[in-house]
Structures are given as structure tokens and as C-alpha cells.
């Protein structure tokens, strides 16, 4: 079949599209020139004119001829005449006189003939005669006394000597030994300082006293026990053991002595004058020494001049 012009034009357009859409990239090696190969030329296409098909005439639309409707008048059915209601003819009632039954004659009551009663006189029975029975008089028979039996004679049972009880030694009581509970030791420690003006330093050789009062009963004076501590060391530290006092509920710690002539006036800082109640004061327990240690103070002495107020610790 010969190639037409239209098909050739389409082939050229497709080739141009493929050329434009092709991916170009730079070759890694320089191109090698090859001599073009001459392909045999195709013969020129022979143009064949298109064959035109005959154009059909447009269809002619004609309205269908519809015959006009023929009017047929409706056929009216014959309406029946309304029914005529006639009353039924009831013949008049014919009166038939009642037939009377013959009347019965009333019954005739006749009294029955009762014979008259025949009187028979009653037969009287004689009244019985009651006679009292004769009861013989009782015959007294004296009682027969049975002989009283003699009291039984009891024989003494033979005495049997029981064997002596076996010897049972008395148990020896050994008192149970209570486990040893070490006594809890109690002690008081603290520091005594001197505050002279703005200078504060520990006092060597100062002492404190512990006053324990026993509350007396009514009308009796209470007794007091006073214990003095050893003199303080160079750091003003004191330590006093309370082994002789069992109850610390009524014990107070107070200042007692200062050997420094320029610092002998006790102050009430931390209750150095009124006394520290040990019952209301906490303690530290040392289990290795079995010791309850009450740490009080620090207490202060001052010189003749009034010292500035010292805060409580």
C-alpha cells in the first residue's frame, strides 16, 4: 500500500517528538567518528486521492397522520324504577270463644267416727316397807405387839498396819539467775564562757551545781540534794556523772562558781541562774557506753560592765 502524505507527516511529527524527549548526557569517553552508511532510498510515495463516500441526504421527518377521534356517545343503561313497597295484607284475627271445662262439684267433708274412750282405772302398787339393817356392834380386838429386835452387835474390824511410805528426798531449790542488765549511766556536760564586753572566752576552773528537790508531803519541808561538778578545763568544758541520783524529774542545773575576778557575775542565758530542768531536756544515748548524756548550756559569766544581749541557742 502506498504511503500517503498524511501518514508521512505523522511519522515526521513522531520522530521530532522522540528527538525532543530523548535524554542527553555527556559521554564518559570521546565519541568515535563513524562514516555514515548510505541506506537505499525508498521510492517516492504515489499519491492516491481519497475516495469520497456519497453524502446521504438528511432524513425528512414527517409527522404521522393521526385520524381525528370519533366521539361515541356513552350508552346509558336503563335505570330501574324504584321498588314499590306494599304492606302485607294481614287477615283480621278470628275470635274463637274459649271452651269451658265442666266445673267439678266441691268435695264433701265427712267427720270420721271416733269411738269414745274407755276409762280403765289405774292399778295401785303397794308402797314398799323399808327396814333398817341390823349392824352388829364392833368387837374390840387388842393389838398384838411385836417384840422389838435387839440392836446389832458390831465387831471391830482387825487393824492392819500400813507399810511405811517410801523415802522421798526434799527438792533443793536453786533460784534462777536473772540475766545481767547493765545499769544505764547518766551524766551532764556543757561549756561555761565569759562574756566581757565584746570579748568571749572559756573559763578555766568554773563549776556548776545540780540541785535535786524531793517534793514533800503536806506540812513538811522538802529536802534538797546538791551535787557540784569538777572544775572546767581550759576549753570551759565540764562533765558530771549522776550515778547517785535515780530520779532526775526534780533536778536543775545552775551556775555555781567562777574563779576569774573580772568575770564573776552569772547571767540567766540558757537558764544559768534559774536552772535547767533535766526532766524537760533531751538527752543523747550512747549504746557503746550505755550512757544517757544531757548537754546543757552554754552558760555565761560577765564582768562588772553590762554585756550586750546574747542570743539563746
From Swiss-Prot:
Induction: By 1-aminocyclo-propane-1-carboxylic acid (ACC) and a-naphthaleneacetic acid (alpha-NAA), ethylene and auxin precursors. Repressed by the ethylene inhibitor 1-a-(2-aminoethoxyvinyl)glycine (AVG). Lower levels in calcium-depleted conditions. It is found in: Secreted, Cell wall. One of its GO terms (cellular component) is plasmodesma. Its main location: secreted. Pfam families: Pollen_Ole_e_1. Sequence repeats lie at residues 30-34, 35-39, 40-43, 44-48, 49-53, 54-57, 58-62, 64-67, 68-72, 73-77, 82-86, 87-91, 92-96, 97-101, 102-105, 106-110, 111-115, 116-120, 121-125, 126-131, 132-136, 137-141, 142-146, 147-150, 151-155, 157-163, 164-168, 169-174, 175-181, 182-186, 187-229, 258-262, 266-270, 298-302, 308-312. Residues 1-22 form the signal peptide. One of its GO terms (biological process) is trichoblast differentiation. Residues 27-312 are annotated as: 35 X 5 AA approximate repeats. Exclusively expressed in roots, particularly in root hairs-containing regions, and especially in root hairs. Keywords: Cell wall, Repeat, Secreted, Signal. Belongs to the plant proline-rich protein superfamily. ENOD12 family. May contribute to cell wall structure in root hairs. PANTHER family: OS01G0164075 PROTEIN, PROLINE-RICH PROTEIN 1-RELATED. This is Proline-rich protein 3. It comes from Arabidopsis thaliana. The gene is PRP3.
